[in-house]
Protein backbone atom coordinates (compact mmCIF):
# COMPACT_ATOMS: atom_id res chain seq x y z
CA UNK A 1 0.00 0.00 0.00
CA UNK A 2 1.31 3.43 -0.93
CA UNK A 3 2.30 5.74 1.89
CA UNK A 4 0.94 9.22 2.47
CA UNK A 5 2.83 12.00 0.68
CA UNK A 6 5.57 13.31 2.94
CA UNK A 7 5.89 10.16 5.04
CA UNK A 8 9.67 10.01 4.78
CA UNK A 9 9.93 7.73 7.81
CA UNK A 10 8.13 5.06 5.80
CA UNK A 11 10.56 5.59 2.92
CA UNK A 12 13.52 5.32 5.29
CA UNK A 13 12.23 2.02 6.66
CA UNK A 14 11.84 0.59 3.17
CA UNK A 15 15.36 1.67 2.24
CA UNK A 16 16.77 -0.07 5.31
CA UNK A 17 14.80 -3.21 4.47
CA UNK A 18 16.39 -3.50 1.02
CA UNK A 19 20.00 -3.17 2.17
CA UNK A 20 20.35 -6.90 2.80
CA UNK A 21 21.14 -8.34 -0.65
CA UNK A 22 22.78 -11.78 -0.25
CA UNK A 23 23.44 -12.14 -3.98
CA UNK A 24 25.06 -8.73 -4.36
CA UNK A 25 28.53 -7.44 -3.40
CA UNK A 26 29.40 -8.41 0.17
CA UNK A 27 25.70 -9.07 0.77
CA UNK A 28 24.68 -5.42 0.90
CA UNK A 29 23.23 -2.73 -1.34
CA UNK A 30 24.40 -0.07 1.12
CA UNK A 31 27.72 0.92 -0.45
CA UNK A 32 26.36 1.26 -3.98
CA UNK A 33 23.50 3.42 -2.69
CA UNK A 34 26.04 5.75 -1.07
CA UNK A 35 27.91 5.89 -4.38
CA UNK A 36 24.65 6.68 -6.20
CA UNK A 37 23.93 9.60 -3.88
CA UNK A 38 27.53 10.81 -4.17
CA UNK A 39 27.56 10.72 -7.96
CA UNK A 40 24.10 12.29 -8.15
CA UNK A 41 25.44 15.41 -6.43
CA UNK A 42 29.12 15.38 -7.41
CA UNK A 43 28.53 17.01 -10.80
CA UNK A 44 28.09 20.46 -9.27
CA UNK A 45 30.05 23.42 -10.65
CA UNK A 46 29.82 26.49 -8.42
CA UNK A 47 31.11 28.85 -11.12
CA UNK A 48 28.16 28.10 -13.40
CA UNK A 49 25.75 26.89 -10.70
CA UNK A 50 25.00 23.76 -12.71
CA UNK A 51 24.82 20.11 -11.77
CA UNK A 52 24.24 18.86 -8.25
CA UNK A 53 21.64 16.70 -6.57
CA UNK A 54 18.53 18.21 -8.15
CA UNK A 55 16.92 16.70 -11.21
CA UNK A 56 17.79 12.97 -10.99
CA UNK A 57 19.70 13.32 -14.24
CA UNK A 58 20.83 9.70 -14.26
CA UNK A 59 17.38 8.82 -15.60
CA UNK A 60 18.76 10.04 -18.93
CA UNK A 61 21.48 8.49 -21.05
CA UNK A 62 23.59 11.65 -21.03
CA UNK A 63 24.29 11.21 -17.30
CA UNK A 64 23.23 7.65 -16.52
CA UNK A 65 25.35 6.32 -19.37
CA UNK A 66 28.46 8.22 -18.29
CA UNK A 67 31.27 5.64 -17.85
CA UNK A 68 31.95 7.22 -14.44
CA UNK A 69 28.50 5.99 -13.39
CA UNK A 70 28.98 2.40 -14.55
CA UNK A 71 27.45 -0.04 -12.09
CA UNK A 72 24.99 2.47 -10.67
CA UNK A 73 22.18 0.93 -12.70
CA UNK A 74 22.15 -1.66 -9.91
CA UNK A 75 21.62 0.99 -7.24
CA UNK A 76 18.85 2.61 -9.25
CA UNK A 77 17.16 -0.74 -9.72
CA UNK A 78 17.38 -1.57 -6.02
CA UNK A 79 15.35 1.56 -5.34
CA UNK A 80 12.57 0.94 -7.87
CA UNK A 81 10.39 -1.08 -5.44
CA UNK A 82 10.69 1.77 -2.93
CA UNK A 83 9.64 4.27 -5.58
CA UNK A 84 6.69 2.04 -6.48
CA UNK A 85 5.52 1.96 -2.86
CA UNK A 86 5.99 5.70 -2.44
CA UNK A 87 5.19 7.20 -5.86
CA UNK A 88 4.99 10.72 -4.44
CA UNK A 89 8.73 10.94 -3.72
CA UNK A 90 10.90 12.30 -6.51
CA UNK A 91 13.85 10.28 -7.76
CA UNK A 92 16.18 13.11 -6.76
CA UNK A 93 14.96 12.96 -3.17
CA UNK A 94 14.89 9.16 -3.06
CA UNK A 95 18.44 8.71 -4.32
CA UNK A 96 19.95 11.23 -1.93
CA UNK A 97 17.92 9.97 1.02
CA UNK A 98 19.00 6.40 0.27
CA UNK A 99 22.66 7.37 0.59
CA UNK A 100 22.11 9.11 3.92
CA UNK A 101 20.07 6.19 5.29
CA UNK A 102 22.63 3.64 4.09
CA UNK A 103 25.54 5.40 5.83
CA UNK A 104 23.67 5.37 9.12
CA UNK A 105 22.51 1.76 8.73
CA UNK A 106 26.11 0.66 8.16
CA UNK A 107 27.27 2.17 11.43
CA UNK A 108 28.04 5.69 10.27
CA UNK A 109 26.82 9.05 11.54
CA UNK A 110 23.33 10.48 11.36
CA UNK A 111 23.40 12.89 8.42
CA UNK A 112 20.91 15.75 8.06
CA UNK A 113 18.68 15.51 5.01
CA UNK A 114 16.06 17.84 3.60
CA UNK A 115 13.39 17.03 1.02
CA UNK A 116 12.06 19.03 -1.91
CA UNK A 117 14.24 18.12 -4.90
CA UNK A 118 12.49 17.86 -8.22
CA UNK A 119 13.13 15.68 -11.26
CA UNK A 120 14.13 17.11 -14.62
CA UNK A 121 11.31 16.99 -17.16
CA UNK A 122 13.88 16.39 -19.92
CA UNK A 123 17.64 16.10 -20.34
CA UNK A 124 18.30 19.74 -21.25
CA UNK A 125 19.65 20.49 -17.76
CA UNK A 126 21.80 17.37 -17.39
CA UNK A 127 25.39 18.47 -16.66
CA UNK A 128 28.20 17.55 -19.06
CA UNK A 129 30.27 14.45 -18.46
CA UNK A 130 33.76 14.65 -17.01
CA UNK A 131 32.93 16.32 -13.70
CA UNK A 132 33.44 13.29 -11.46
CA UNK A 133 36.90 12.35 -10.09
CA UNK A 134 39.35 10.37 -12.22
CA UNK A 135 40.90 7.87 -9.80
CA UNK A 136 44.08 7.54 -11.89
CA UNK A 137 45.09 11.11 -11.03
CA UNK A 138 46.87 12.84 -8.15
CA UNK A 139 46.35 15.62 -5.63
CA UNK A 140 46.13 18.45 -8.17
CA UNK A 141 43.24 16.76 -9.97
CA UNK A 142 41.50 15.98 -6.69
CA UNK A 143 41.63 19.65 -5.74
CA UNK A 144 40.42 20.75 -9.17
CA UNK A 145 37.36 18.50 -8.90
CA UNK A 146 36.44 19.27 -5.31
CA UNK A 147 37.29 22.98 -5.33
CA UNK A 148 34.96 23.27 -8.34
CA UNK A 149 32.17 22.01 -6.08
CA UNK A 150 33.13 24.35 -3.25
CA UNK A 151 34.95 22.02 -0.84
CA UNK A 152 38.17 22.78 1.04
CA UNK A 153 41.05 20.40 1.81
CA UNK A 154 39.65 19.19 5.12
CA UNK A 155 36.28 18.47 3.52
CA UNK A 156 37.97 16.63 0.64
CA UNK A 157 39.70 14.23 3.02
CA UNK A 158 36.54 13.72 5.08
CA UNK A 159 34.51 12.86 1.97
CA UNK A 160 37.24 10.46 0.85
CA UNK A 161 36.48 8.46 3.97
CA UNK A 162 33.46 7.07 2.13
CA UNK A 163 35.98 4.62 0.67
CA UNK A 164 35.54 2.65 3.86
CA UNK A 165 32.52 1.29 1.97
CA UNK A 166 32.22 -0.89 -1.11
CA UNK A 167 34.67 -2.21 -3.65
CA UNK A 168 35.86 -1.58 -7.21
CA UNK A 169 35.10 -3.75 -10.24
CA UNK A 170 37.22 -3.85 -13.41
CA UNK A 171 34.12 -3.70 -15.62
CA UNK A 172 33.00 -0.48 -13.94
CA UNK A 173 36.02 1.60 -12.95
CA UNK A 174 38.88 -0.52 -14.25
CA UNK A 175 40.09 -1.09 -10.68
CA UNK A 176 39.53 -4.15 -8.51
CA UNK A 177 39.09 -4.88 -4.83
CA UNK A 178 38.00 -3.40 -1.53
CA UNK A 179 39.65 -0.66 0.50
CA UNK A 180 39.00 -2.10 3.96
CA UNK A 181 38.37 -5.48 5.58
CA UNK A 182 34.64 -4.96 6.10
CA UNK A 183 33.31 -2.90 3.19
CA UNK A 184 29.78 -2.77 4.58
CA UNK A 185 30.74 -1.12 7.89
CA UNK A 186 31.37 2.61 8.04
CA UNK A 187 34.50 3.40 10.05
CA UNK A 188 37.81 5.27 9.96
CA UNK A 189 39.76 2.14 8.92
CA UNK A 190 40.37 3.68 5.50
CA UNK A 191 42.56 6.35 7.10
CA UNK A 192 44.30 3.88 9.39
CA UNK A 193 45.18 1.62 6.47
CA UNK A 194 46.39 4.48 4.31
CA UNK A 195 49.10 5.17 6.87
CA UNK A 196 49.84 1.72 8.29
CA UNK A 197 50.29 -0.47 5.21
CA UNK A 198 53.13 -0.80 2.73
CA UNK A 199 51.22 -0.20 -0.48
CA UNK A 200 52.79 -1.71 -3.61
CA UNK A 201 51.86 -0.95 -7.19
CA UNK A 202 49.84 -3.53 -9.10
CA UNK A 203 48.49 -3.56 -12.66
CA UNK A 204 44.86 -4.64 -12.90
CA UNK A 205 44.51 -7.59 -15.26
CA UNK A 206 42.45 -6.79 -18.31
CA UNK A 207 42.41 -3.02 -17.84
CA UNK A 208 46.07 -2.10 -17.42
CA UNK A 209 45.31 0.47 -14.74
CA UNK A 210 47.70 0.96 -11.85
CA UNK A 211 46.44 0.61 -8.30
CA UNK A 212 48.08 -0.19 -4.99
CA UNK A 213 47.62 -3.30 -2.85
CA UNK A 214 48.56 -4.68 0.54
CA UNK A 215 47.78 -8.00 2.21
CA UNK A 216 46.32 -7.98 5.71
CA UNK A 217 48.61 -10.25 7.72
CA UNK A 218 45.79 -11.31 10.05
CA UNK A 219 42.93 -11.99 7.65
CA UNK A 220 44.86 -12.62 4.44
CA UNK A 221 42.63 -10.11 2.63
CA UNK A 222 44.16 -8.26 -0.29
CA UNK A 223 43.17 -4.63 0.12
CA UNK A 224 43.61 -1.88 -2.41
CA UNK A 225 44.00 1.87 -2.75
CA UNK A 226 43.57 4.08 -5.80
CA UNK A 227 46.14 6.63 -6.97
CA UNK A 228 43.83 9.38 -5.73
CA UNK A 229 43.73 7.70 -2.31
CA UNK A 230 47.49 7.65 -1.96
CA UNK A 231 47.67 11.28 -3.05
CA UNK A 232 46.08 12.05 0.31
CA UNK A 233 49.22 10.80 2.05
CA UNK A 234 51.79 12.35 -0.29
CA UNK A 235 50.28 15.83 -0.14
CA UNK A 236 51.23 17.44 3.19
CA UNK A 237 47.94 19.30 3.73
CA UNK A 238 45.79 16.29 2.89
CA UNK A 239 48.08 14.05 4.98
CA UNK A 240 47.51 16.18 8.05
CA UNK A 241 43.79 15.44 7.95
CA UNK A 242 44.34 11.77 7.16
CA UNK A 243 46.30 11.55 10.42
CA UNK A 244 43.63 13.46 12.34
CA UNK A 245 40.86 11.14 11.17
CA UNK A 246 43.02 8.07 11.74
CA UNK A 247 43.36 9.06 15.38
CA UNK A 248 39.84 10.35 16.01
CA UNK A 249 36.92 8.41 14.55
CA UNK A 250 34.37 10.57 16.37
CA UNK A 251 35.73 13.70 14.70
CA UNK A 252 35.75 11.95 11.34
CA UNK A 253 32.10 10.95 11.77
CA UNK A 254 31.14 14.50 12.76
CA UNK A 255 33.01 16.04 9.83
CA UNK A 256 31.70 13.46 7.38
CA UNK A 257 28.11 14.15 8.43
CA UNK A 258 28.58 17.87 7.79
CA UNK A 259 30.31 17.50 4.45
CA UNK A 260 27.99 14.79 3.11
CA UNK A 261 25.05 17.01 4.03
CA UNK A 262 26.76 19.82 2.10
CA UNK A 263 27.29 17.47 -0.86
CA UNK A 264 23.62 16.45 -0.92
CA UNK A 265 22.60 20.14 -1.03
CA UNK A 266 24.84 21.12 -3.96
CA UNK A 267 22.82 22.82 -6.67
CA UNK A 268 19.79 23.22 -4.41
CA UNK A 269 18.25 26.63 -3.80
CA UNK A 270 15.91 27.01 -0.82
CA UNK A 271 13.82 29.88 0.49
CA UNK A 272 13.74 31.01 4.11
CA UNK A 273 11.38 28.16 4.97
CA UNK A 274 13.61 25.53 3.38
CA UNK A 275 11.47 24.99 0.28
CA UNK A 276 13.37 24.21 -2.91
CA UNK A 277 12.92 27.03 -5.40
CA UNK A 278 14.93 25.82 -8.41
CA UNK A 279 12.76 27.34 -11.14
CA UNK A 280 13.98 25.28 -14.08
CA UNK A 281 12.51 22.04 -12.75
CA UNK A 282 9.10 20.47 -12.43
CA UNK A 283 7.76 17.51 -10.56
CA UNK A 284 9.06 15.00 -13.05
CA UNK A 285 7.54 11.62 -13.73
CA UNK A 286 9.17 8.28 -14.34
CA UNK A 287 11.88 8.03 -16.95
CA UNK A 288 13.48 4.63 -17.35
CA UNK A 289 17.10 4.57 -16.28
CA UNK A 290 19.46 3.88 -19.21
CA UNK A 291 20.95 0.43 -19.57
CA UNK A 292 18.48 -0.87 -17.03
CA UNK A 293 18.77 -4.60 -16.51
CA UNK A 294 16.11 -7.16 -15.74
CA UNK A 295 18.34 -8.77 -13.15
CA UNK A 296 20.73 -7.07 -10.79
CA UNK A 297 24.31 -8.03 -11.56
CA UNK A 298 26.14 -9.27 -8.49
CA UNK A 299 29.57 -9.32 -10.10
CA UNK A 300 30.42 -6.45 -12.40
Swiss-Prot record:
A single GO BP: hydrogen peroxide catabolic process
Catalytic residues (positions): 39, 179
CDD domains, sorted: ascorbate_peroxidase (cd00691)
Keywords, ordered alphabetically: Heme, Iron, Metal-binding, Oxidoreductase, Peroxidase
Residues holding heme b: 163
Its EC number(s): 1.11.1.-
Cofactor needs: heme b
InterPro entries in the cross-refs: Ccp1-like, Haem_peroxidase, Haem_peroxidase_sf, Peroxidase_I, Peroxidases_AS, Peroxidases_heam-ligand_BS
PANTHER family linked to this entry: L-ASCORBATE PEROXIDASE 3, THYLAKOID LUMENAL 29 KDA PROTEIN, CHLOROPLASTIC-RELATED
Functional note: Destroys radicals which are normally produced within the cells and which are toxic to biological systems.
Name assigned to this protein: Putative heme-binding peroxidase
Organism: Pyricularia oryzae (strain 70-15 / ATCC MYA-4617 / FGSC 8958)
Amino acid sequence: MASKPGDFDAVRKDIVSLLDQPEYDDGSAGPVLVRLAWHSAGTYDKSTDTGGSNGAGMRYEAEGGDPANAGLQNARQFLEPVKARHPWITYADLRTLAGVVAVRAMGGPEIPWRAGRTDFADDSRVPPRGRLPDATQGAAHVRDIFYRMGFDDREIVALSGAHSLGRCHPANSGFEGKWVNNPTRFSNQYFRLLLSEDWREKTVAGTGLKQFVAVDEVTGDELMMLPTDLSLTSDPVFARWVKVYRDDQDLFFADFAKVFDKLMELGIKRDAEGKVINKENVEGGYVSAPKKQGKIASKL
